[in-house]
Regions:
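Enzyme catalytic cores with a strong preference for nitrogen-chemistry domains
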Residues: 1-348, 366-375, 407
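ATP/NTP-dependent adenylation/nucleotidyl-transfer catalytic domains that generate, transfer
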Residues: 161, 219-220, 229-232, 246, ...
Length: 636
């Protein structure tokens, strides 16, 4: 359970209705197999020891006694296994029959959780046999041991402080106020649901929606185990629709109509991180809950779950198109409001033939179109200098012309050389002064053009550059409204591609496609043989790595060691551990050192769950030490 990862399973085994010996044998085998696969928690369906469809046989004492004996056997089977199992059975307490879930671990029955909501409608008639349980925890004696009995039980372990298990049963989830709500507010990070949900047309879709929604609302892992083949088909069919969800995402799901065991790793640190960030998620006092300790080992869980190497970019084409349109709409509406509020006559955008300025101009055009303002009031300024190549220059010119905006060219070589003379800088020394002088000269021109035309300078810098501080302070770092400030570099490429695919303008399409094929570069150093010599990703590292690091740092507050571990999984076969670690060190060093630039960012719209605005999502002192992060990085 290192880094908060715990491997969990949802299993449906073959059963025979009312044959507790057969069912118990299959349950124990599934538990043993799961333990061999380093699974720490396995959940079985509702009433799996007897079968859900026993009907009036539930009123037979021999069946109830046999189920209790089977539970003792199942618990005994876990004695030498590092696993916790949750199984379903009918249980009599104080002369009343309950539909229960039993949690077994280390050879013991750790707790019995009764079903609170007993359905008695349509095909369900559980009230005929079962009584609704209570939240209050009492104790029952099973095989000489006092076992907690009630809904309000939290199962915890010293092996992982974030592991807190609670249980609800089938219909409990379908109600307006599922027990899992209170469980989660009491601290539960994992909800186990033992279910017997029969199949009717499209019910699987609703079932999935419930599981996803509950895991999202509660910031929890949700393990749903469904009855399957072997249940009586007298009137109903059960398909074993097992699911494991985490914060609104289905991580694993079985193929329906096949009894299967599905497993994956839940990231409990991630869930707790989400809860800590949300001040409206209030963990209430747990005085009404009983905590039960489970015997579990920490271990080093191998990550088998999918880790997205581009977490900012939807992998599905249709979702990506929808997301692209949504982001462009957010950006353009933000700019539209600012233009409208300031009564700006123009918008000034510096165009370089690169991705960022391309997106900024596309957004500006959208804003002007929505305001019904002539595109000629958009002034695209190209400012060639020492590092400008013919390719980027021509793309900038063709791009602006194809959009129908006003194009202005200001060659800044003479101005920068004069500046070098004024400050006594040798123009043959290609240092930070050489580079930043060009960036600041460009910003000065844009600001002055905006003043002259009564307009606003539209910022082009993206979120990835801001995270790394890859911007000249008071140069391209500054603008009057930064439309790209909330968009990471890996996503910008897809936004530009989206616009390229949807345009009917052949020149614009061709130009955008060539811009997409151009290496990312600030073009501040002279080209070699007419080609770009200064490639950003050769200097600061691959943006796909940095965006991955940024996402996990900002979204979940993950430690460097965990981010490295996740990156190794996500980028397997692309980057080896040493390369990832090298750029991870660069990322942390730059992220901390460059906060002073982020502390004085221009306004700009937030577009995603990760943002760096000092007025909103990220308030970090500019002089914070990164010593403890660096210390951990050196141990990796």
């Amino acid at each position: 359970m290192k880094d908060g990862f715990v491997r969990c399973a949802s299993a449906t085994v073959d059963i025979k209705v009312a044959d507790t010996d057969y069912n118990t044998s299959n349950i124990i085998k599934a538990i043993e197999d799961a333990a061999q696969n380093n699974i720490k928690l396995i959940v079985f369906p509702e009433l799996c020891i007897t079968g859900y469809t026993c009907g009036d046989l539930f009123l037979q004492k021999i069946l109830i006694d046999s189920a209790k004996d089977s539970l003792i056997k199942i618990a005994k089977a876990t004695e030498n296994l590092d696993i916790t199992a949750v199984v379903g059975l009918p249980y009599v307490a104080e002369q009343t029959l309950y539909n229960c879930a039993a949690v077994v671990n280390g050879g013991h029955i750790k707790g019995l959780v009764p079903k609170l909501n007993i359905p008695n409608y349509a095909e369900f008639y559980e009230v005929r046999h079962f009584t609704a349980g209570k939240n209050e925890v009492t104790y029952v004696n099973i095989n000489g041991e006092e076992v907690p009995f009630g809904a309000n039980i939290l199962f915890k372990t010293d092996a992982c402080e974030d592991f807190v298990l609670a249980v609800e049963i089938c219909e409990d989830l379908w109600t307006a106020m599922p027990p899992s709500v209170n469980h989660a507010l009491a601290g539960a990070t994992i909800i186990a649901n033992l279910s017997a949900s029969n199949e009717v047309i499209a019910k699987d879709e609703y079932r999935e929606m419930l599981v996803k929604s509950q895991s999202a609302k509660l910031y929890c892992g949700y393990i749903y185990s469904d009855a399957g083949y072997g249940e009586s088909t007298t009137d109903l069919v059960f398909a074993g629709d097992n699911m494991i969800a985490e914060n609104g995402t289905i991580l694993a799901r079985s193929k329906r109509f096949n009894n299967e065991c599905v497993y994956t790793e839940l990231d409990l640190e991630r869930l707790v991180g989400e809860r800590k960030k949300s001040n409206t998620y209030n963990i209430v006092g747990s005085e009404k809950y009983v905590s039960v300790k489970l015997d579990m080992n920490i271990g080093d869980t191998k990550i088998t779950r999918y880790v997205d190497k581009q977490p900012f970019v939807p992998s599905d084409d249709k979702k990506r198109e929808k997301r692209s349109e949504e982001i462009l709409s957010i950006q353009s509406l933000g700019l539209k409001k600012r233009l409208d509020h300031t009564h700006a006559k123009t918008a000034v955008v510096g165009v370089s033939g690169g991705l960022d300025s391309t997106l900024a101009l596309l957004v500006t055009v959208r804003a002007f179109d929505s305001l019904n303002i002539d595109r000629k009031n958009i002034i695209a300024v190209t400012m060639p200098c020492f590092g400008t190549t013919d390719r980027t220059y021509n793309n900038a010119v063709n791009f602006a012309n194809s959009l129908g905006v006003t194009l202005k060219e200001v060659n800044i070589k003479a101005a920068v050389n004069q500046h070098f003379a004024d400050i006594e800088h040798d123009p043959n020394v290609y240092d930070v002064t050489y580079e930043n002088s060009q960036a600041r000269e460009r910003t000065q021109i844009l600001m002055d053009v905006a003043n002259k035309s009564g307009g606003l300078v539209i910022g082009t810098g993206d979120m990835s550059e801001l995270a790394l501080g890859w911007a000249t302070y008071n140069g391209d770092h500054m603008s009057m409204y930064g439309v790209n400030a909330g968009v990471p570099k890996t996503l910008i490429r897809y936004l530009v591609d989206y616009e390229a695919k949807r345009t009917n303008n052949d020149i614009l399409k061709k130009t955008l496609q060539d811009i997409l094929d151009t290496p990312v570069s600030p073009e501040l150093l002279p080209p070699k043989d007419g080609k770009i010599s200064q490639k950003t990703e050769h200097i600061v590292g691959p943006y796909e790595l940095h965006d991955f690091f940024l996402y996990h740092l900002m979204r979940f507050g993950s430690k460097p060691s965990k981010i490295l571990r996740l990156a190794e999984v996500a980028f397997e076969g692309i980057y080896d551990r040493e390369v990832i670690l090298e750029w991870l060190k660069v990322f942390y060093r730059r992220f901390f050192a460059q906060q002073f630039k982020r502390s004085c960012l221009p306004d700009g719209p937030k577009v995603g769950s990760v943002a760096l605005s000092p007025r909103g999502d990220w308030r970090m002192p500019s002089d914070a030490s990164y010593q403890i992060w660096a210390k951990e990085l050196e141990t990796l």
